[in-house]
Amino acid sequence: MFSPVAEIREEDGVKLYWTPASPFTRKVGVVARELSLWEKIEIVPTTWSLEWGYRTVPFTPGLADANPVARIPTLVTDDGDALGDSTLACLYLNDRSTDRKVIPDDTSKWRMWSLYAVADGMLEAQILMRAEHLRPQNIRSNSFIEKQKDRIERCLDAIELRAGELEGPLDLGQITVGVTLSYQDWREWLDDFRSGRPELSAWYKNFADRPSMRATEPQETPEH
């Protein structure tokens, strides 16, 4: 089971505002582990009222000061720069790593970024659905939920057609696809992605067994 505890090294000073339920935050956590940087990060757990999806709720102390958008993940670098976006946080960690990279440094990076954008857009649709499901029934929009489901199905079909790109050296595109599929599995109101997508299903079965994925399995975020 995932435990958001990392060794804190004062000389590094990198902080990550975290929730174990967020796939965007998990993406950063997987990257940090794959790049052997996890132990250099101070994890700051955040709490969220279940009303976060439709109204302003109290924030964990320090989050809104670091990032006025008050979004997670927010990574604060050792220079004090707040990166309030998972893509920026992954770019920072990739740049910081000296032994391994998850972002190619040649022209193949554009194909990776293309796949990444599809998977990241699917993550966004999943979280928009989550927020809508948290709204009281009388103000919930079923048509909005269906709109996000349609987006997710399109993204899954597109990734299935590009499943061959998921092979080869580990990169950020693969990580984001893996995290997205895991979230699709975790939330019971999201449809099973495996039906009609044999290539994606076979790839995910192996990817989900990576130590970085097992160590960051999602859990519900504390409300208090």
Regions found by a protein language model. Give the residues of each.
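GST-like fold's C-terminal all-alpha helical module
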Residues: 119-205
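Short, surface-exposed recognition loops or helix-turn segments adjacent to catalytic cores
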Residues: 105-108, 170-172, 218-221
